[in-house]
């Protein structure tokens, strides 16, 4: 009888954990690929990248937003507004931030600060957070600061602008995280609606830049970004992350996805031949330890 009672809970936990760790892999791929796209020899326009991300997702997920007629009726205006923070505000701030600061600094700030913001918002909304999870969030925060500390102090390089923008992006994603938990929507419904309205809001203000950038960008580069921004970031990562939030809750899901700075550092070693220093390695270890505590895995 006890085994039967525990089994469904264990199954739900496994689904959430799988979704969260898949999200880590997708985010790592996206951060490194996007940094290369906006800071290479021929950087792509961030507005074009945003259009590719949300436009592709809007087409792929069309059946879902069509059934909802674009606006989920069960959501209050506040919840609906909170969901939209995962759209244009988040995407444009990430692209801008990655243009101003290296991925090795922006990555830890973006994903490492998510648990901190989510826990803060949850506490404001009256949700209970265990002490052990708070300790884990503290370790994650220390790890992110350790990795980015040298960059934050070097103001003359201008990286601090990217750091501030990335923190704004993390706050936007955290607002979405808490809003989704209270929305009653499925992962695919939330992703579909966010993509649709982000595309509709972007076109009137960025149409001229989008057309100009499309004409100037090689077809191969466009196809690569359709895969990276549209499929990986616009559809897959949003679905897997939202699924993780559904099964694990906001605090636990964001704690696991805070592993991204560590995985991004490892990816940089093997893909970009960037060997992390002692500070970066220490920060990654702190983040991993914080994730284990804040996620409730042990």
What residues fall within each predicted segment?
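Transmembrane alpha-helices of multi-pass small-molecule transport proteins
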Residues: 2, 42-89, 117-121, 172-176, ...
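Glycine-/small-residue-enriched transmembrane alpha-helix faces in small-molecule transporters
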Residues: 2-51, 142, 152-182, 200-204
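Cytoplasmic-side transmembrane-helix entry/capping segments in multi-pass membrane proteins
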Residues: 20-21, 75-84, 129-141, 162-163, ...
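Specific transmembrane alpha-helical segments of multi-pass solute transporters/efflux pumps
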Residues: 25-31, 62-110, 146, 230-248
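Membrane-interface helix termini and inter-helical loops of multi-pass transporters
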Residues: 32-43, 99, 148-159, 207-226, ...
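Hydrophobic/aromatic residues within transmembrane alpha-helices
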Residues: 37, 49, 53, 97, ...
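Specific alpha-helical transmembrane segments that line the substrate/conduction pathway
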Residues: 48-58, 95-128, 169, 250-269
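Hydrophobic transmembrane alpha-helices of multi-pass small-molecule transport proteins
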Residues: 61, 129-151, 202, 258, ...
């Amino acid at each position: 009888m006890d085994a039967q009672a525990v089994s469904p809970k264990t199954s739900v936990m496994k689904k959430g954990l799988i979704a969260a760790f898949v999200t880590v892999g997708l985010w790592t791929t996206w951060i490194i690929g996007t940094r290369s796209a906006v800071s290479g020899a021929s950087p792509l326009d961030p507005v074009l990248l945003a259009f590719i991300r949300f436009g592709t997702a809007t087409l792929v997920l069309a059946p879902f937003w069509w059934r909802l007629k674009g606006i989920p009726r069960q959501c209050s205006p506040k919840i609906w507004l909170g969901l939209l923070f995962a759209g244009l505000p988040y995407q444009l701030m990430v692209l801008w931030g990655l243009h101003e600061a290296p991925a090795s600094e922006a990555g830890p700030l973006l994903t490492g600060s998510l648990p901190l913001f989510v826990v803060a918002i949850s506490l404001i909304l009256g949700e209970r957070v265990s002490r052990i999870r708070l300790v884990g969030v503290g370790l994650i925060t220390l790890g992110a600061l350790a990795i980015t500390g040298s960059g934050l102090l070097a103001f003359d390089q201008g990286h601090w602008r990217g750091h501030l923008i990335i923190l704004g992006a993390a706050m936007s994603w955290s607002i979405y995280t808490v809003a989704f938990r209270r929305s009653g929507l499925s992962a695919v419904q939330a992703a579909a609606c966010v993509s649709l309205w982000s595309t509709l809001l972007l076109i009137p203000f960025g149409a001229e830049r989008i057309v100009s950038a499309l004409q100037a960008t090689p077809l191969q580069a466009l196809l690569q970004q359709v895969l990276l921004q549209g499929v990986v970031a616009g559809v897959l990562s949003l679905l897997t992350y939202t699924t993780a939030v559904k099964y694990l809750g906001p605090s636990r899901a964001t704690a696991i996805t805070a592993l991204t700075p560590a995985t991004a550092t490892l990816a940089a070693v093997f893909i970009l031949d960037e060997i992390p220093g002692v500070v970066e390695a220490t920060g990654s270890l702190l983040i991993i330890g914080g994730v284990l505590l804040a996620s409730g895995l042990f």
